[in-house]
Amino acid sequence: MTELTEADAADLFRAPPDRMVPVGGAEVAVRTVGSGPDTLLIHGWPVSGATFRRLLPHLARCATCHVVDLPGAGASRFT
């Protein structure tokens, strides 16, 4: 795996999400990066998954990071 830089992590949140997951009345955006044990990163309110952009280069070295945008934040949307 190529090492993820902070700039790469920032670009990750400018691009469309890897997948949209239906949850209740919403579609939750999920981005996945890294390799290793699965790690779920859930942001607080009123921010988005992009809040982890500086942390991702470090975590992605040893974990598969699944970063979600909660409904109403980032690329997620209510349906």
Describe these PLM feature segments.
Residues 26-78:
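Conserved HGGG/HGGXW glycine-rich cap/lid loop of the alpha/beta-hydrolase fold
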